[in-house]
């Protein structure tokens, strides 16, 4: 349960408010039993982006882990030098954070040649770059609610959704989208 350490931070007063798309595990149990003074705000991914863009939600510092970044800050969820072991795909969720945060710090294990374009996050939205040994294991993205389904009904829904996208008029070279568990 990767969120369990938040309990100690809340008890110390370091975390006073949480806005999230979901809670589970020990943190959810602790909050349900009165751990926090303020209620948790639950938002869909789309509403989160809208809340940030309309100043209903403020980001002081965005820490963004990414598989590649150049020396100026152009950041991507893929690595173009052939090493795909850290690729995580679209950084759509992080793009909004980077653009609206007071400060944006990109954490990467791979600083590539300038320019790292096309990029998900442009250099103008990045304040600092920190090279680290390892950004994490992208296999961890596929866990819990994001595991691949073998359920025929869910597969049919996915196939129909893909058909809608393919026939939308927007599906062409350069098309990019990000999915979630909703």
Where are these regions (language model features)?
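Conserved alpha/beta enzyme-core scaffold
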Residues: 1-181
